[in-house]
């Protein structure tokens, strides 16, 4: 009987794989070693087994080349197994024909490191990327061509523009040639364009250009928003979706305007109506692709779940960290089978002496908002300089580990029950009533219901599944609930952090704090002993810990007091305009000094600046290296960019009547300040990153 069941399962799986090959018009799915990666209407199939992977975005050209390997390892420690990255055209070809693929722009080296670290990679090719980059990543010389030739239209199926896109795709492919999945490399997919209305033949032309260039990969994608103009040919490009906890792009200066709260409910609609609302109409963000209701449907994947968010000048969003878990819980409960985060790791824009490399209202393209010139921290789980935002990092990691161990089963389970706060998929129950700002006391969790395992049935739990180690099932407590597991009709109340029997099952419920130290590495559950994060290095386990330096201190001297604050003007897009360089002549100026004598490596040293004001900038020998729009959080600066140079911190005062959105906590700070404006420097600390290495006995 067992042989018959096994044969039947193999037959059904072979039909599924065959269907995937026939349904979607994608590239080579097998490596030279015979590993396969396929797509069907449910999800991804790796070596014949359905999986629910987790994708996280990092931009290599916004992170120092020397940090790539370590930061990729930290992303993997957080549960990321597919990395996505934009290839910003403007970063690589700022002048026509003059390409830069060196240093932080060395795409080939980044891809090789992904291969060496055994993580899959999706390349977002452009030509338009957005990413809060100047002109969305399209170089100025392209805009100049469009201005000189009315037949040359950007992001359109016009000969001149498509010729330049062909050069772009060919040049990108030359950098990754030999590193695709079919070559045994990490590149499993490419995204064509970004947030494009189409029409469809424009996207189809770009895909054909990519394929002709050599991008023969297991799948091709596009963003599933906005609604496309023209009928889509099914199976050419996977639409990937997103949702954000809040949006800097919104025009309104109020808490959670529009439909941001909808990101925190279960729903059967895939398209968010809250992404890029400054660009797209409500109608363009309200229609799912017609193909979704067709007999042959796409799997439900996301590429832009935003637990973090950038502050724009006019909208200073402060992410508290609790937003990420409810977002992914709601998507999984609604049937999604690939969480993809934007951003998972922040970064810093490359310096350009001619203009900012961040989005600005004054540019000819992507000009709806003013973003910082340099910082792109995004309040992500891993921040601009690699600092850990603990709540989203760990709460996301718990779910990602659960998906690693139970994702193959979850993927096979359809949505059986769906309401605003509750969903059930087979043996998994999803619950969320947390809503950013509107219901901060809410909770979010996933639990078992009638789950058959190890010869027993888990009837229900008040704890969340975390991981499996041999025959031991680890759970994590849900705060405020008694930790209980019902097995075969009997209820077991669990002691935290103690292994015990629950009927036929071996279980252990970790406290929330203990779980934050627990990492499953090579089939073992290891614990960080110093409050840091654990990741695997070449020959050992590394614990990374960040502390205030005990050997180096910064001294700050005020050299100029601020002048009266500027009157904040409105920009071209009718929202507040950020200050220009000339405005900083009115800033308070401080010099920052520190003694690093005897040190020859500064890569692990950072300044953490706590200030109050409008905008802060740090200059090294007169060159801008860091900036920050105040939203109540600290500013981070790499000391490697400062050592041996004259360091100046400039802070502009914040007018109380500035036409800028702040959340209630920041509003209270502003209103509590005496006078007409707020300005203060509370601390400048040197933070040191330590890496502690352990052998197998760890």
Region annotations inferred by a language model:
Residues 86, 91, 95-98, 103, ...:
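Aromatic- and acidic-residue-enriched carbohydrate-binding clefts of CAZyme catalytic domains
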Residues 68-136, 207, 211-212:
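Aromatic-lined substrate-binding rim segments of carbohydrate-active enzymes
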Residues 140, 511-531, 538, 546-563, ...:
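Glycine/proline-rich low-complexity spacer/linker segments in large multi-domain proteins
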Residues 20-82, 112, 671, 685-693:
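N-terminal carbohydrate-binding accessory modules
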Residues 150, 161-177, 183-191, 197-210, ...:
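Carbohydrate-binding surfaces of carbohydrate-active enzymes
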Residues 1-21:
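Bacterial Sec-dependent N-terminal signal peptides
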């Amino acid at each position: 009987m067992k042989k018959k069941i096994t044969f039947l399962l193999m037959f059904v799986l072979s039909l599924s794989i065959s269907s995937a090959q026939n349904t979607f018009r994608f590239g080579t799915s097998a490596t030279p070693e015979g590993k396969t990666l396929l797509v069907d209407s449910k999800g991804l199939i790796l070596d014949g087994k359905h999986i629910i992977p987790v994708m996280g975005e990092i931009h290599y050209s916004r992170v120092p080349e020397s940090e790539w390997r370590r930061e990729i390892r930290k992303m993997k420690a957080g549960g990321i197994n597919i990395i996505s990255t934009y290839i910003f055209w403007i970063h690589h070809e700022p002048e026509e024909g003059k390409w830069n693929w060196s240093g932080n722009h060395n795409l080939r080296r980044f891809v090789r490191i992904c291969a060496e670290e055994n993580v899959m990679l999706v390349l977002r090719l452009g030509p338009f990327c957005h990413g809060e980059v100047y002109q969305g990543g399209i170089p100025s010389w392209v805009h100049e061509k469009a201005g000189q030739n009315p037949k040359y239209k950007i992001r359109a199926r016009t000969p001149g523009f498509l010729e330049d896109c062909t050069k772009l795709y060919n040049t990108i492919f030359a950098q990754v040639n030999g590193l695709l999945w079919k070559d045994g490399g990490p590149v499993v997919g490419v995204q064509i364009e970004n947030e494009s209305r189409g029409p469809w033949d424009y996207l189809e032309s770009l895909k054909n250009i990519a394929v002709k260039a050599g991008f023969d990969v297991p799948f091709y994608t596009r963003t599933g928003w906005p609604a496309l103009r023209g009928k889509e040919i099914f199976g050419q490009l996977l639409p990937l979706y997103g949702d954000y906890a809040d949006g800097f792009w919104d025009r309104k200066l109020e808490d959670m305007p529009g439909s941001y709260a909808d990101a925190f409910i279960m729903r059967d609609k895939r398209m968010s109506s809250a992404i890029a609302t400054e660009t797209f109409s409500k109608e363009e963000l309200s229609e799912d692709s017609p193909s979704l209701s067709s007999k042959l449907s796409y799997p439900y994947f996301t590429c832009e779940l935003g637990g973090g968010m950038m502050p724009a000048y006019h909208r200073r969003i402060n992410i508290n960290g609790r937003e990420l878990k409810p977002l992914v819980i709601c998507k999984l409960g609604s049937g999604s089978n690939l969480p993809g985060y934007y951003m998972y790791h922040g970064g810093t824009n490359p310096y350009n002496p001619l203009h900012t490399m961040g989005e600005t209202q004054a540019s000819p393209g992507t000009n709806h908002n003013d973003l910082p010139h340099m910082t792109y921290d995004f309040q992500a789980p891993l921040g601009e300089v690699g600092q850990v935002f603990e709540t989203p990092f760990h709460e996301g990691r718990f779910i990602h580990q659960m998906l690693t161990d139970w994702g193959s089963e979850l993927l096979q389970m359809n949505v059986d029950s769906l309401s605003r706060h509750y969903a059930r998929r087979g043996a998994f129950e999803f619950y969320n009533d947390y809503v950013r700002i509107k219901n901060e006391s809410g909770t979010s969790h996933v639990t078992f219901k009638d789950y058959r395992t190890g010869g027993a049935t888990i009837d229900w739990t008040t704890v969340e599944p975390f991981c499996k180690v041999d025959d031991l099932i680890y759970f994590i407590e849900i705060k405020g609930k008694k930790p209980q597991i019902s097995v075969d009709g009997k209820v077991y109340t669990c002691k935290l952090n103690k292994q015990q029997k629950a009927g036929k099952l071996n279980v252990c419920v970790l406290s929330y704090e203990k779980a934050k130290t627990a990492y499953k590495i090579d089939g073992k559950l290891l614990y960080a002993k110093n409050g840091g994060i654990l990741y695997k290095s070449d020959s050992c386990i590394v614990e990374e810990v960040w502390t205030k330096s005990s050997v180096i201190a910064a001294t700050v001297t005020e050299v100029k007091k601020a002048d009266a604050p500027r009157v904040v003007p409105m920009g071209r897009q009718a929202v507040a305009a950020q200050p220009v360089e000339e405005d900083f002549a009115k800033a308070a100026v401080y010099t920052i000094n520190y003694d690093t004598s005897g040190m020859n490596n500064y890569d692990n040293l950072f300044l953490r600046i706590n200030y109050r004001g409008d905008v802060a900038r740090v200059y090294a020998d007169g060159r801008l290296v860091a900036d920050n729009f105040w939203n109540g959080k600290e500013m981070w600066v790499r000391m490697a960019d400062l050592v041996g140079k004259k360091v100046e911190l400039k802070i502009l005062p914040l007018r109380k009547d500035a036409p800028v959105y702040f959340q209630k906590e920041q509003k209270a700070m502003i209103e509590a300040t005496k006078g007409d404006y707020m300005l203060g420097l509370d601390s400048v600390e040197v933070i040191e990153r330590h890496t502690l290495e352990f052998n197998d006995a760890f």
